[in-house]
């Protein structure tokens, strides 16, 4: 739950500072759940440089409910929103897409080939450092929680533009014995990847290549923005 909130910070090009946490949990589950949950939080707090400053712990009848409010800061007061794209901008995405959906679909498989996918599903990696690095390059950005198509549509709608996505350029995970159509469907519609999807001017493409090398994160040019025409999302080579 903390990592999902950290991904929201990353999508704004912001640095997370601290957070509040509220947990509602049945008493019979607290003894087993709380120590493990606290251990995971402490590890993430240290790794991402964020502190817990307050919150609340209450008892519930049945379900475990977790609410997090996160606070951060932007560089030079420059936060990236979802509505800054211009016609002619390029569309980039970090990492590979569809891995989390593959992990979910094969969660109970005993095959070790799905271990990385399961980890991606259970423990998403918020791209906080990447978001900070492209803060002045990206002019609109979102983290992919609902799949490439739906989240790209959010960017297109907010800027009142169409996005042309080249299906052949979408970065897919590599799995032997899984058909490309299945991998592509997971990437386009699966969600929970928490990679960054963003727009930038064509003149920034070289700078992004340098950032990709520096951060050891693949940044793939998957499409471009154009004046709105009929649909928000246009798929090429589909």
Where are these regions (language model features)?
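Catalytic-loop motifs flanking and including active-site residues across diverse enzymes
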Residues: 1, 130, 148
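Glycine-rich phosphate/pyrophosphate-binding loop regions near the starts of catalytic domains
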Residues: 1-93
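Gly/Ser/Thr-rich helix-start
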Residues: 14, 55-56, 73, 85, ...
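A short alpha-helix capping/helix-coil boundary motif
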Residues: 17-23, 109-110, 130-133, 186-188
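Active-site-proximal beta-alpha loop/turn segments in soluble metabolic enzymes
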Residues: 22-27, 107, 113-115, 193
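Glycine-/charge-enriched secondary-structure boundary and capping motifs
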Residues: 27-53, 59-66, 71, 136-137, ...
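A generic local structural motif
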Residues: 54, 78-79, 128-129, 182-185
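Short, acidic (Asp/Glu-rich) active-site segment that either coordinates a divalent metal cofactor
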Residues: 65, 80-132
